[in-house]
Amino acid sequence: MALIHEELYKGENTDTLNFSTYIKELAENLFQTYSLSSKNIHLNMDLEENALFNMDVAVPLGIIINELVSNSLKHAFPGRDSGEVRIELRREKNGKHKKECNKVTSFILAVSDNGIGIPENLKIEVAGSLGIQLITALVHQLDGELELNRNNGAEFIIKFSVREKSNQASHPAV
């Protein structure tokens, strides 16, 4: 939360956040916190530029990313000296929620790792872990969709839509 406030005050507008910049700082801070210097775990990010989100979107997404990256760093690479955590944020082409009069943009956030993966018998819809319950609740709060891909590690895919603000013509806040 402190990082969100810091990023807000750096920007020109105090009600929207450049989310890509925030994700970079958050992920780098998490990697430092878990001090992975003895392991060769890499962070790879592919982030949409000018993804300006209001606080109703930025705060839940920030908590989701924090939970997923922390989980990868704590659990994905036991006994392994190398690996990768990847974060991707992009606008979805032909999003299902686009309307002409109320411009809504669909986004995809994917957080993945190439670690040991998540057991097939773990159903995220009924998972008992507090982290998964929190992620599920926050995705629901965003009126989004959560998908788990178990190929080559774990990949959480979150699809969500945001209404664009009409008061900024060149870089609309979403």
Which residues make up each language-model segment?
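Glycine-rich nucleotide-binding loop
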Residues: 117, 151-157
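Conserved short strand/loop->alpha-helix "switch" segment adjacent to the catalytic nucleotide/phosphoryl-transfer site
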Residues: 14-17, 36-69, 73-85, 126
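Glycine-rich/acidic phosphate-handling loop/turn and adjacent ATP-lid/helix
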Residues: 96-132
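Short beta-strand/loop element within the Bergerat-fold HATPase_c
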Residues: 82-103
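Glycine-rich ATP-binding loops of the HATPase_c
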Residues: 142-149
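C-terminal end segment of the histidine kinase catalytic
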Residues: 158-174
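Short beta-to-alpha transition helix within the HATPase_c
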Residues: 3, 16-33, 88-94
